[in-house]
């Protein structure tokens, strides 16, 4: 099963304690009564997640592996984690969006993310629940969050 953008927001907000956001969202696809509103708002307020455009979050859409990497990278930085190693030997590294390359290199170097069996990263593929849970867990371990 793939993870929707709003589901990823909930997983990360809960895992790392982002809550009580005061920021109102400008996304037309996020209503205050939606179950995910507070999670998206908390991550937006902390500079961790952005919409697909200024007025659209992308509710109901699968999160890509590269977008998840960016969100986890920003989460780590917000938690004060300093990345020391980088790894960019994925066979499809050139297919990773420029905005996500630093995140992918850093998370791979920290062993938070790994590639597919064929050595690729598959940046535009949807992140599965298993992949997302493993990445969140690995990040929690390295920043000494409660697991």
Predicted regions and their residues:
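Catalytic cores of secreted/periplasmic or lumenal enzymes
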Residues: 104
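Short intrinsically disordered, low-complexity segments
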Residues: 131-137
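Feature responds to low-complexity, polar/acidic, surface-exposed segments characteristic
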Residues: 1-6, 12-39, 45-101, 114-127, ...
């Amino acid at each position: 099963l793939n993870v929707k953008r709003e589901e990823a927001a909930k997983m990360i907000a809960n895992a790392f304690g982002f809550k009580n956001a005061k920021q109102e969202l400008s996304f037309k696809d996020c209503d205050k009564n939606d179950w995910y509103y507070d999670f998206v708002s908390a991550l937006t307020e902390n500079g961790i997640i952005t919409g697909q455009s200024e007025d659209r979050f992308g509710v109901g859409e699968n999160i890509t592996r590269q977008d998840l990497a960016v969100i986890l990278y920003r989460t780590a930085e917000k938690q004060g984690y300093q990345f020391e190693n980088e790894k960019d030997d994925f066979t499809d590294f050139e297919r990773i969006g420029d905005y996500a390359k630093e995140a992918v290199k850093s998370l791979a170097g920290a062993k938070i993310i790994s590639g597919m069996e064929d050595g690729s990263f598959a940046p535009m593929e949807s992140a599965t629940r298993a992949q997302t849970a493993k990445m969140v867990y690995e990040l929690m371990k390295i920043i000494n969050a409660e697991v």
